[in-house]
UniProtKB/Swiss-Prot annotation:
This is Bromodomain-containing protein 2. PANTHER family: BROMODOMAIN-CONTAINING PROTEIN 2, FALZ-RELATED BROMODOMAIN-CONTAINING PROTEINS. The modification Phosphothreonine is found at T6. One of its GO terms (biological process) is nucleosome assembly. The lineage of its organism: Eukaryota, Metazoa, Chordata, Craniata, Vertebrata. The first bromo domain specifically recognizes histone H4 acetylated at 'Lys-12' (H4K12ac). It also specifically binds histone H4 acetyl-methylated at 'Lys-5' and 'Lys-12' (H4K5acme and H4K12acme, respectively). The second bromo domain recognizes and binds histone H4 acetylated at 'Lys-5' and 'Lys-12' (H4K5ac and H4K12ac, respectively). Gene3D superfamilies: 1.20.1270.220, Bromodomain-like (1.20.920.10). The modification N-acetylmethionine is found at M1.
Amino acid sequence: MLQNVTPHKLPGEGNAGLLGLGPEAAAPGKRIRKPSLLYEGFESPTMASVPALQLAPANPPPPEVSNPKKPGRVTNQLQYLHKVVMKALWKHQFAWPFRQPVDAVKLGLPDYHKIIKQPMDMGTIKRRLENNYYWAASECMQDFNTMFTNCYIYNKPTDDIVLMAQTLEKIFLQKVASMPQEEQELVVTIPKNSHKKGAKLAALQGSITSAHQVPAVSSVSHTALYTPPPEIPTTVLNIPHPSVISSPLLKSLHSAGPPLLAVSAAPPAQPLAKKKGVKRKADTTTPTPTAILAPGSPASPPGSLEPKAARLPPMRRESGRPIKPPRKDLPDSQQQHQSSKKGKLSEQLKHCNGILKELLSKKHAAYAWPFYKPVDASALGLHDYHDIIKHPMDLSTVKRKMENRDYRDAQEFAADVRLMFSNCYKYNPPDHDVVAMARKLQDVFEFRYAKMPDEPLEPGPLPVSTALPPGLAKSSSESSSEESSSESSSEEEEEEDEEDEEEESESSDSEEERAHRLAELQEQLRAVHEQLAALSQGPISKPKRKREKKEKKKKRKAEKHRGRIGIDEDDKGPRAPRPLQPKKSKKAGGGGSNATTLSHPGFGTSAGSSNKLPKKAQKTAPPVLPTGYDSEEEEESRPMSYDEKRQLSLDINKLPGEKLGRVVHIIQAREPSLRDSNPEEIEIDFETLKPSTLRELERYVLSCLRKKPRKPYTIRKPVGKTKEELALEKKRELEKRLQDVSGQLNSTKKPPKKASEKTESSAQQVAVSRLSASSSSSDSSSSSSSSSSSDTSDSDSG
């Protein structure tokens, strides 16, 4: 009896899953235990029902992978889908359930084909690509879309298979974002042995379909193509695979479902541009294939893409490979021209280039992909996009501008990147997923941009610090003297040329060169005499208006904008006294640096005043010694003018290091806000100090400088208020040059020494009169002007 039962039992073993039998019966390959005689009657009805079950409907035929009647072709986009997209998905660890059609019979899913009317899997798509089944890339993308959608329709959202499908779909969308924008047909010549290869491929593809099959593997899209309510059987709840995807990812992928319905309404007449919908923030918030291709859009007719194929350059027919448009001859020459035009990136732009590479890297691709390419508003049906966004921007444009060296500095680069993000925020609602992606990417950008290295800057004006050592103050004042007036610089160049030529003449023994050199120097001497005579006669006839000018200048100082001060300076008097200071520095050695500070009004304050002071230009300097006042209190409370503050800052820098401690003590004693500051390094802003503090500083500085043997205030005198004084100083400067030229004449040749001695003695007399004139009042200065002019006439006659 037992022997008769066993053969009848075995045929039903393969259908145990469908019958709902116990796990022992369902397990394939398990030995059937011998039933006892007790249950003989129980098993006999089962035997009778086996033939009926064998009549159950089998799986429907798989989707076709080739159709001779349906024209297919090879395009650049289809080739990209085959070689790049399919290759990446096929090798993924979650791809195994999607590599072959769903075997509903084997998996015990009797309702699968009732719910899913159009099954699709990656194996079918792969074989269709290999057989050139598709006419356009949009058809292939529609098949991917169907596969993912089927999976979402049939299974519960919490099932592992759904999470696996979402992961694959995300990778699919990222890859499609980099697909060529314009679809072009590629002409492929079939080699002679293609039939053998095709047979091998068919055999290989046939073996793929016999692989292990898994339940409920379908397809992805948040907009369901089929509306029947999903009836989810409990048999699909647990899929034996270790990988589980986090729930935040699931939420992020599901969150943008409803808004994408609007995108899917894009006109289906542009299937090759549909892929761009995946790429852009304003168009598709979450990576969903609805943006790629509207569900239910008709397949592209065979002739729809013919014009684009006609644009291709002529192909070589003897090659079996798909030939791409020529990219060697023309781009090479262009690259050579571009490389010659491209300059070296600055340090900051190199950092920006690194930021750009990071934004385009795979590390951030999950939320950066919508920003890779420009928004294709027409393909995505965003008809108001360019009305709202006037200046579109994307990372590919930024990259192109960076490669073409269009960015002059890092600020221009940052402006374009921030424009891209602001466009996203402007066009999309705040709760849109693409806005969240933009914020995440912008965080990456701002974090990296904050680490921007500083460009090596030219040394600028130093802030005022009373703790600066005198040597540092000297160097800053000397740097300011280099920016003196054009007149003084030209005169200095003449003198330097003279000195250089003098050295050359000394080194040469030729008598002719010495004679020629002597003639040149005498010519220069004559020109200096003429200039001196003209200056000494000019300003004497003009009346004095010193007091009126002082009052006018005070009023104008309060009213004028800082930028107009330089104009007044040109109107009120010549820039003659400026050349005097460089001369003094040559003659006086170390003390000359203090005089140099005054050589250029705009920059002289850099060593001795606050950051505010250098912005103004000096008009005139007040009398150095404080004038008499009725009372000491009145003097202390009298506010200090800008020129006085500037002069005070210059004087402080002239003090030796041991005197600066007292300056700090005066400031800290009279200014409560600075009492806690570090005495080693204290910054003085003269605009914030009290008038009494400034007057006390002025008194102390004057007392220190008055003790010195050289008279420092004669240097400040040239910045006088009247044109007479300016002309006088110009004349003295010319006398000084005359003396220098005379010295050169002496060194050049011995015979004319008598004449040069005579000239030098007269110049020395002039120098004595200059010292006496500078220490006297304004009245005596005018008298010294006449005396110096008489000296000049003597020197001319000599």
